[in-house]
Amino acid sequence: MLRFFRYFLELVYPSRCPGCGKLIHTGGDLWCWQCQTQVWNPRMIRSSCTEHLSGCYTLTDYEKGMRKCLIDLKFNHKVPSARGFHLFLEKFPWWDSLADFRVAIPVPLSMEHARQRGYNQTDIIFEDWMIKQGKTYLSDGIIKIRNTVPQLQLLRNDRRHNLEHAFHVNRGVSLKGEKVLLLEQRCLRLIQNFKRCA
């Protein structure tokens, strides 16, 4: 019965690539091959390692279909298209090296953006996936305690100071001794010393 229902839905609402909108076969990937190859570029960002940060990984380039999909999710409330991100999470080549990072926490939005959107897009992209991988997902593990100027409006030297003392570990959350995956929609950051980040 479930198979028939899915078949019926596919006839009425055919699957489309979230990147370009082209019709795709439901038995395959959610992204068309062309969009996948245009954005798929897993790597560790150079200069991302610091005393307290093990590295910053990114799975795709932020352009073309990926940029469109993230903008649709953030600003146009196209939440169903977020299921397409799991394809890239599945293909990420370094999950084995992250096995001892047991806790996953999204970078929090400002209170104003959270109120406007009603959700944190990072939760929508990562939460189900991380839970299926056996990670403890703390959607409110970090809170933003003061508003900041959008980073895009600042010079490189001013960006670090803009974020100082902007985040804090939420009351009742203990991360002492934990290695934490700090998640953001445009990159996956690894934090070993959480105090420095907070």
PLM ranges: what are they?
Residues 1-198:
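Glycine-rich phosphate/pyrophosphate-handling loop used in enzymes and phosphotransfer proteins
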